[in-house]
Amino acid sequence: MAATMSEPRRVGFVGAGRMAEAIARGLIQAGKVEAKQVLASAPTDNNLCHFRALGCQTTHSNHEVLQNCPLVIFATKPQVLPTVLAEVAPIVTTEHIIVSVAAGISLSTMEGLLPPNTRVLRVSPNLPCVVQEGAMVMARGHHAGNDDAELLQNLLEACGQCIEVPESYVDIHTGLSGSGVAFVCTFSEALAEGAIKMGMPSGLAHRIAAQTLLGTAKMLQQEGKHPAQLRTDVLTPAGTTIHGLHALERGGFRAATMSAVEAATCRAKELSKK
């Protein structure tokens, strides 16, 4: 019988890097799965030690993970995922739910490497999953049903927000949210450096910049306002904010940000075609 949301689950990880650890940590801390019910594999002990510290089981055998876990999350590097899927394909059954968090590997590619009727889902996470504040999207393959999608979504919400989308949105999510973490960090750095230029100590400036981003994000989420409305709430005629915004517009801030998301998305689409 396939796993359902009410059944005990063993969750497997093939690949034990930072994203795999972040997801495992979120699942365990949220009580979605017991640490002893998590089994992770990797070629070496370099990353497995982090799983052991969580109380998880570890192995160097990918086959062992598939043999013991009905739900397996593949968190390998994208360039090695096809080889790994081909390796485990002989022991994949219709009882398995196969999940990939590797960028650039399409559902059709995974389905083509695995036995017919394999239930496959694809997840695009981002780095804040490490602190259980991730922004994730997921897409399902041809044979993954509603129960499979609900099960995975329920699990991953331990790591942040998880929304089911058409697969065509996954590469866009990579540009918006996967790469977007770096874009936001660049803005936070520049924000702080502006204050440093005006005489504020570096450590204080970076703390305030980060808190400003955090507080603004919470207001956008909790109040449900469009960013333009919240921005307008800060403006006063001839005040400091409108002068600062004018400087941003002169520098092409809005267009540069849109172009960054576009460039990252286009690159993600290129990688998906390889």
From Swiss-Prot:
The keyword Membrane does not apply. It catalyses: L-proline + NADP(+) = (S)-1-pyrroline-5-carboxylate + NADPH + 2 H(+); L-proline + NAD(+) = (S)-1-pyrroline-5-carboxylate + NADH + 2 H(+). GO terms for biological process: cytidine deamination; L-proline biosynthetic process. Gene3D superfamilies: NAD(P)-binding Rossmann-like Domain, ProC C-terminal domain-like. One of its GO terms (cellular component) is cytosol. Keywords: Acetylation, Amino-acid biosynthesis, Cytoplasm, NADP, Oxidoreductase, Proline biosynthesis. Its EC number is 1.5.1.2. Pathway: Amino-acid biosynthesis; L-proline biosynthesis; L-proline from L-glutamate 5-semialdehyde: step 1/1. Pfam families: F420_oxidored, P5CR_dimer. The modification N-acetylalanine is found at A2. It is an enzyme of class 1 (oxidoreductase). It comes from the Eukaryota. It is found in: Cytoplasm. GO terms for molecular function: cytidine deaminase activity; identical protein binding; pyrroline-5-carboxylate reductase activity. Homodecamer; composed of 5 homodimers. Oxidoreductase that catalyzes the last step in proline biosynthesis, which corresponds to the reduction of pyrroline-5-carboxylate (P5C) to L-proline using NAD(P)H. Proline is synthesized from either glutamate or ornithine; both are converted to P5C, and then to proline via pyrroline-5-carboxylate reductases (PYCRs). PYCR3 is exclusively linked to the biosynthesis of proline from ornithine. Belongs to the pyrroline-5-carboxylate reductase family. This is Pyrroline-5-carboxylate reductase 3. It comes from Mus musculus. The gene is Pycr3.
